[in-house]
């Protein structure tokens, strides 16, 4: 992926402002509520039968925080995201058997939560474009093992 300096700045400056313990759980909860078929990968999380159960599930929140924390690897390796996520791609493909489209769905929910948090004056269209490009690079890297 080729990054412009403006894209790098938009991505890294927003990353410094993100509270991963806020955005991560929000995005994961939304994913599991809006896209309930994704719940099959989280059977060990306990009760996911209702939106209220998902909203109050500590394991969902913790996994959302873990996922957001994992984005730091991509931030630190923007010029080689595919290799930075090689082992995670293998794990999600060969061990967990996650549908790679779920990565894209979660990226959409992360973007939505960021837009809601920062608002249109701070999460401008240009910032959104950079973040979507970044998250698509991450999802592509995670799906790499599937190809």
Curated annotation (Swiss-Prot):
It holds the Pfam family Globin. Residues 2-147 form the Globin domain. Red blood cells. InterPro entries: Globin, Globin-like_sf, Globin/Proto, Hemoglobin_b, Hemoglobin_oxygen_transport. Involved in oxygen transport from gills to the various peripheral tissues. Belongs to the globin family. Keywords: Heme, Iron, Metal-binding, Oxygen transport, Transport. GO terms for molecular function: haptoglobin binding; heme binding; metal ion binding; organic acid binding; oxygen binding; oxygen carrier activity; peroxidase activity. One of its GO terms (biological process) is hydrogen peroxide catabolic process. The keyword Iron applies. SUPFAM superfamilies: Globin-like (SSF46458). It comes from Anguilla anguilla. This is Hemoglobin anodic subunit beta. The gene is hbb1. The keyword Heme applies. Heterotetramer of two alpha chains and two beta chains. This fish has two hemoglobins: cathodic and anodic. The cathodic Hb and anodic Hb display small and large Bohr effects respectively. In addition, the cathodic Hb displays a reverse Bohr effect and appreciable phosphate effects. One of its GO terms (cellular component) is blood microparticle. Heme b binds at residues 63, 92.
């Amino acid at each position: 992926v080729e990054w412009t300096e403006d894209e790098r700045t938009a991505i890294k400056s927003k990353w410094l402002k993100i509270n991963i313990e806020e955005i991560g759980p929000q995005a994961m909860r939304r994913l599991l509520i809006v896209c309930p078929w994704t719940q099959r990968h989280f059977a060990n999380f306990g009760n996911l039968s209702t939106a209220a159960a998902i909203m109050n599930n500590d394991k969902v929140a913790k996994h959302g925080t873990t996922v957001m924390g994992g984005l730091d690897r991509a931030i630190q390796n923007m010029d080689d995201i595919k290799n930075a996520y090689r082992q995670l791609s293998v794990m999600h493909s060969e061990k967990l058997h996650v549908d790679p489209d779920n990565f894209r769905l979660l990226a959409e929910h992360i973007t939505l939560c960021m837009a809601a948090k920062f608002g249109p004056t701070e999460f401008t269209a240009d910032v959104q474009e950079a973040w979507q490009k970044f998250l698509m690079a991450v999802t592509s890297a995670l799906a790499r093992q599937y190809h």
